[in-house]
Amino acid sequence: MQPMTKKKHTTASKRSPARPPSLSPPLESRRRVGGKSPERLHGNAPPTPPRSPLPPSPSPEHTRRLSPQRRRPQRQRKL
């Protein structure tokens, strides 16, 4: 009876830790992709990254970075 309970505990203990690690890699990959995607979305604007991978991304970055600065003074002057 004792060995049986020990085996059950060992199997249960092995199953419990085996489940988190098996779920952790996909979660880590999703977290990594999710962590990188929001940064790229906020930095390069959401619509551009999914449609264009990298080459077109730098141009929208500079154009959009310079455009808000130019638009802001114009808006302030208009106001």
UniProtKB/Swiss-Prot annotation:
Chain positions covered by the region annotation Disordered: 1-79
Basic residues: bias regions: 1-12, 65-79
Biased composition range(s): Pro residues: 46-59
Name under which the protein is recorded: Protein B2
